């Protein structure tokens, strides 16, 4: 165990604190219910990290974590969504309300779960249940201090106020976007969902299927994806029964076979690592440490990094109608970016359906992130080469009056 690994484990699961004990044991939590002791009592060296302290005998070294906004804080089975202003028409936005003098997070979540609603909103001594809708879309978070009123039944929890609600997502599935089928009539155009491998194509297909209600197809056939619910996987890519076609192809002939395309672009540093993990660990697996340290990784970067650039350049050059979507923008603002994608596909954008997708955006096709490398696998020479490819793609995008690559692509 190392401090980094423990912190990463807890942060990935959405906890506020990480604690280490006995030099090797990692604990996660949302609150600290013990008093401070002298730091000298934490005297055990981390078993996986010489020179660092990982608690002691019945003593925890505790770290407060800086969570990314997307990180999901959890209380039992419920996922913390944030602090939000009371909606204008409360009874329409959140149709079930119950007074709870002895309010706690668990009590409100249990009530809404029992009533089969995916949202539980705590408002002081009132609990409200409902769905994310245009009346209550959960898009404008407020400062959590505005919701910091303590629960009457649990002093370490916040229960919101009559004006500012603390919102949790229950385990109840929002079924408004779960129906999927093949197109009722053969499509008159072939639309590609094009990406470099590792850029999130499988995840994007999941989002598109939920948002449109139609299956996506593939230029290839992957039996494991078919078995996980991608029923369009078995159809020939020209069948016309699917809303769009997954492809990693980048040749002129292959590109010109499509009438339009959604071009999904991802930070090459992240895409290369994701594809390397897939190649050696499956769609939601991870490459072994030996693969990163062996000859496989340098050879992979040497072969795949140029392809990352030429893939985008070819689609921009030969594509008939190309909508560029950056993976990072899709993660950051799914509602807007997915709406753009659905519009290109010729399907009416239903806002309530997009809100439903937001609550189930990960599906079962995202790597958990719990096995991150503790070092940067990119050498200085690799970074120099990849940075040149990033600048090349950025210039090509701007040359077509499109937004360039996101700022976090560089510098590293």
Describe each PLM feature range.
Residues 1-176:
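Peripheral, non-catalytic regulatory segments
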Residues 318-344:
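Phosphate-binding beta-loop-alpha motif at adenosine-nucleotide cofactor sites
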Residues 24-25, 107, 126, 133, ...:
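Non-catalytic cap/lid and distal C-terminal segments of serine-dependent acyl enzymes
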Residues 5, 107, 202-203, 307, ...:
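Acidic, Ser/Thr-rich intrinsically disordered and amphipathic helical segments
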Residues 173-325, 370-412:
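PAPS-dependent sulfotransferase catalytic domain
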Residues 212-213, 337-351:
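Non-catalytic, well-ordered alpha-helical segments in soluble enzyme domains
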């Amino acid at each position: 165990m190392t401090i980094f690994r423990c912190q990463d484990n807890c942060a990935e699961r959405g906890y506020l604190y990480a604690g280490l004990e006995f030099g090797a044991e990692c604990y996660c939590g949302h609150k600290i219910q013990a008093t401070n002791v002298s730091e000298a009592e934490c005297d055990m060296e981390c078993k996986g990290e010489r020179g660092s302290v990982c608690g002691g005998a019945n003593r925890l070294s505790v770290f407060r974590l800086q969570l990314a906004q997307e990180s999901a804080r959890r209380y039992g089975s419920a996922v913390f969504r944030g602090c939000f202003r009371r909606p204008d028409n409360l009874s329409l936005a959140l149709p079930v309300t119950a007074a709870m003098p002895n309010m706690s997070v668990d009590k409100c979540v249990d009530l809404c779960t029992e009533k089969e609603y995916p949202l539980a909103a705590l408002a002081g001594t009132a609990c409200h249940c409902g769905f994310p809708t245009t009346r209550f879309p959960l898009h404008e978070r407020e400062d959590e201090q505005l919701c910091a009123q303590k629960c009457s039944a649990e002093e370490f929890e916040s229960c919101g106020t009559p004006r500012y609600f603390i919102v949790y997502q229950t385990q109840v599935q929002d079924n408004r976007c779960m129906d999927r089928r093949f197109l009722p009539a053969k499509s008159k155009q072939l639309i590609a969902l094009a990406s470099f491998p590792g850029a999130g194509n499988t995840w994007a297909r999941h989002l598109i299927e939920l948002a449109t209600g139609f299956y996506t197809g593939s230029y290839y056939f992957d039996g494991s994806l078919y078995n996980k619910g991608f029923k369009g996987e078995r159809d020939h890519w020209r069948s016309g029964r699917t809303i769009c076609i997954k492809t990693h192809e980048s040749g002129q002939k292959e590109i010109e076979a499509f009438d339009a395309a959604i071009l999904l672009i991802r930070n090459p540093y992240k895409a290369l690592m994701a594809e390397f993990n897939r190649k050696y660990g499956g769609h939601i697996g991870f490459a072994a440490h030996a693969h990163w340290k062996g000859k496989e990784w340098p050879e992979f970067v040497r072969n795949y990094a140029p392809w990352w650039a030429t893939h985008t350049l070819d689609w921009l050059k030969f594509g008939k109608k190309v909508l560029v979507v950056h993976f990072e923008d899709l993660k950051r603002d799914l509602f807007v970016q997915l709406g753009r994608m659905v519009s290109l596909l010729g399907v009416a954008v239903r806002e309530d359906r997009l809100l439903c997708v937001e609550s189930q955006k990960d599906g079962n096709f995202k790597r958990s992130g719990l096995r991150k490398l503790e070092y940067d696998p990119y050498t200085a020479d690799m970074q120099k080469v990849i940075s040149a490819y990033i600048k090349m793609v950025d210039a090509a995008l701007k040359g077509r009056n499109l937004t360039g690559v996101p700022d976090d692509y560089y510098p590293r």
